[in-house]
A protein has these predicted regions:
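Core catalytic lobe of class I
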Residues: 1-164
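S-adenosyl-L-methionine
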Residues: 168-207
Length: 207
């Protein structure tokens, strides 16, 4: 995707996020540093105040073609300019922009899967228990799982059918609760157990 098209894509996504956040709602955006300019511009143009950029320092490098191998990931931090943002009293003023968390040894679920303790750090700092957290790029469902563990409510979405399935499977495996998991397809409410059977039956036919 060309740079200008990518900017428009980000701007549209961030505007949709902004429309569904409460006044002063905080936002964190993990992103690739090579696209930092587009991310920052779209973030600000969508109505967010860019308060700072935190750095996730990983315990090992991510091999690539760059002369310098990447061992960090930037995280934009900001909030809507239409109200006062929430900051946890327990967080105080001792938090820093450097976040040292080990990256997953294997990313079987998603190539950029985040560890839950990493995501819990900003979520706890910027939201109260039972608050709603939105993630419009669900990926492997790490934000959903983190909210489950920190007593938050997560609204997430994922356009890729493969990773939407990963999110469902991961949630059921981690919580052990499939009874309340379902998919609405063409107006029909389909239980998770029926979806699993549908996949298994399809696999048997392909053998």
């Amino acid at each position: 995707m060309k740079s200008d098209k990518f900017y428009e894509f980000l701007l549209s996504a961030f505007k949709n996020m902004a429309e569904h956040l409460e006044k002063g709602g905080a936002a964190y955006v993990f992103h690739a540093d090579t696209e930092g300019l587009n991310f920052r511009k779209a973030f600000v143009d969508a109505g967010f105040h860019l308060s700072g950029c935190c750095i996730w320092v990983k315990n090992s490098i991510v091999l690539g073609r760059s002369d310098y191998q990447w061992q960090h990931e930037p995280v934009l931090y900001g909030f809507l300019q239409n109200g006062k943002h929430y900051w946890s009293k327990t967080a105080g003023r001792s938090q820093t922009t450097i976040w040292n968390f080990d990256k997953p040894k294997k990313n079987q679920n998603h190539p950029t899967s985040k560890p839950l303790d990493l995501l819990a750090y900003p979520i706890v700092n910027s939201s109260m228990e039972n608050a709603i957290v939105i993630d419009t790029f669900g990926g492997s469902g790490s934000t959903l799982m983190t909210c489950e563990k920190t007593n938050r409510i997560c609204y997430t979405m994922e356009l890729d059918e493969k990773y939407a399935s990963v999110i469902l499977r991961r949630y059921v495996e981690d919580t052990g609760n499939a009874d309340n998991v379902f998919v609405i397809r063409n107006g029909d409410k389909i239980p998770y157990s029926a979806l699993v059977k549908e996949v298994e039956d399809g696999d048997e036919k392909n053998e």
